[in-house]
Amino acid sequence: MTKGLSWGWTAIKYLAVFLVIYTAINWWRQPVMPANPDLQLTDYQGQTVDIAAMSHDSPVLVYFWGSWCAVCKITSPTVQSLAQSSPYPVVTIAIQSGDNQELRQYLKAKSFNFTTINDEEGDIFKAWQGQVTPSFVILKDGEMTQGLTGVQPEWSLRLRLWLSSVF
């Protein structure tokens, strides 16, 4: 009995250390909102997307990804599901994923129909000091409330958007 209890405490300690390290790495790698960000952008179809205005109605999830990113192949379907079924707007920024025609073909092949800004040269991502893809930012009232990186389950993104709408 003592052996089982000891194992349980060891597992809890390792979990706590893992969570602290995971949180620290995520905090360090998260994008940083520029001082004067350009939040009125044009999507790959030529439509104006005013993220700041959208964020005054409800929190907006901004998803930085690339067609070349292996992890994004896991997270993009989650973002697609969220964009289709969530009351919160989703805007994606495709980083260095080709010209508008190549991006259009990629999105069509994957059946993604979320709003997408084509960051052909990666300038938007650089302005946000992005370090890794995928990266997520939640904006509310034109301000960044949360930044995340890596694989994020849909329930976590939904919860974070809801919390941003409440607080």
Please state what every model-predicted region is.
Residues 35, 58, 131-132:
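Short, small/polar residue-rich loop motifs at catalytic or cofactor-binding pockets
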Residues 41-44, 138:
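Hydrophobic beta-strand positions
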Residues 108-112, 120-167:
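Thiol/disulfide oxidoreductase modules built on the thioredoxin-like
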Residues 42, 115-119:
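Short acidic-hydrophobic, aromatic-tinged amphipathic segments that line or gate anion-handling sites
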Residues 61-62, 90, 136:
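Hydrophobic beta-strand anchors of alpha/beta hydrolase catalytic cores
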Residues 50-73:
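Short active-site neighborhood of thiol/selenol oxidoreductases, capturing the structured segment around
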Residues 1-42, 167:
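N-terminal targeting signals for export/organelle localization
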Residues 73-110, 120-126:
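Structural microenvironment flanking redox-active thiols in thiol-disulfide oxidoreductases
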